[in-house]
């Protein structure tokens, strides 16, 4: 038995599909992050608005200290503290990240949104081996076994061209060069195929 859609229904379905494609993956509206300091109020991010659609790349350009990192950390809810004042909207896949309960936000981190920090030593645990840091991230978000996670960790390190990945998983961050640590951070960020990836200062050494 076949199903025939009337002209009006077909038009509605087409409009809905087009609307879904046109919907921004990330919609930022009048985003502000101010810090209370001894000298008064520091306006690090002051009224930022933009749309980012799936598959697009957006570059935020500005001099050092202009608020680029604060902007991405605000969207990811990483600017914590009693002196931080945030307002506006950051809607990701229809959800306002700024109003999500932190329990839901922790599920978004790493799985749907990831960030590659400028200094990998701030994102890698210096006393935990590389392999464990990758496998714990993978197991938390993908629910795979230890054996599967280890195999995936090696594959991820190989994908970012880390030589002798099978050996590197047993190394500590300080035993790698800065460039290799950055590649590890990239591997972790890409592990769960996030829909949105922030890269802090991607063109620096």
Give the ranges of each region predicted by the language model.
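Conserved ABC transporter NBD signature motif
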Residues: 84-96
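Conserved ABC ATPase "signature" region
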Residues: 96, 148-167
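Hydrophobic anchor residue at the start of the ABC signature
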Residues: 134, 186
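Conserved ABC ATPase signature
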Residues: 171-176, 180
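A short, proline-enriched helix->beta-strand linker immediately N-terminal to the Walker B motif
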Residues: 191-195
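Catalytic Walker B motif of ABC-type/P-loop ATPase nucleotide-binding domains
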Residues: 197-200
């Amino acid at each position: 038995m076949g199903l025939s859609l009337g002209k009006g229904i077909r038009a509605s379905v087409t409009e809905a599909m087009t609307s879904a494609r046109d919907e921004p993956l990330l919609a930022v509206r009048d985003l502000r992050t101010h810090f209370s300091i001894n000298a008064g109020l520091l306006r690090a991010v002051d009224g930022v608005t933009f749309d980012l659609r799936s598959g697009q790349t957006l570059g935020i350009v500005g001099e050092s200290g202009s608020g680029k990192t604060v902007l991405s950390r605000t969207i990811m809810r990483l600017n914590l503290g009693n002196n931080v004042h945030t307002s506006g909207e950051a809607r990701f896949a229809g959800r306002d990240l700024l109003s999500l309960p932190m329990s839901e936000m922790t599920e978004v981190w790493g799985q749907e949104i990831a960030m590659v920090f400028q200094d990998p030593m701030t994102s890698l645990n210096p006393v935990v081996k590389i392999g464990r840091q990758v496998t714990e991230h993978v197991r938390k978000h993908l629910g795979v076994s230890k054996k599967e996670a280890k195999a995936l960790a090696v594959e991820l390190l190989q994908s970012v061209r880390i030589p002798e990945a099978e050996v590197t998983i047993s190394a500590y961050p300080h035993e790698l060069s800065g460039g290799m640590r950055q590649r590890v951070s990239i591997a972790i960020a890409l592990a769960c195929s996030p829909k949105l990836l922030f890269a802090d200062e991607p063109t620096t050494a």
